[in-house]
Amino acid sequence: MARIVVMGAGLGGMSAAYELREVLGKGHDITLVGKGGQFGFTPSNPWLAVGWRQQEQITLDVAGHVGKHGIAFNGDGVERIDADRDAVVTGGGERIPYDYLLVCTGPKLAFEEVPGTGPDGGFTQSVCTTPHAAHAWEAYQAFLQDPGPVVIGAVAGASCFGPAYE
């Protein structure tokens, strides 16, 4: 029996964990490690940002859903990989051993690379995460109270910003 750790509980990690369970059956331990207990369906973030969806319509509780498929979940995130001992160490200090490690962490947002960007203190909005999209909706509502010019675009180095233009 193999111990498989899937690092990242976003679109890639959730899909990978479910696919592994389906292909490998119940004979192997699969542990999904993500930061926080909520999964947000990223492709729906633009709809959240314009008010076509509510946050609860595009999020779900990870532990409850993966648990039904015999997949363990840890919501503390991975603090570090201990490759010498074949284990990940979570943000809560738990050491989770693995025989196989699948890294599905997704992008690391780097708004600090371009001054003035980012939803936290910048002059821009984002739909990269569900909380960002919810904040963008709130900012849009405030904008409607005092309208002005709008610029839509992406900064150099941005990847996969197509969904924002939907």
Name these PLM-found stretches.
Residues 2-72, 156-166:
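Beta1-alpha1 glycine-rich phosphate/pyrophosphate-binding loop at the start
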Residues 71-165:
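FAD-binding core/adjacent interface of flavoenzyme oxidoreductases
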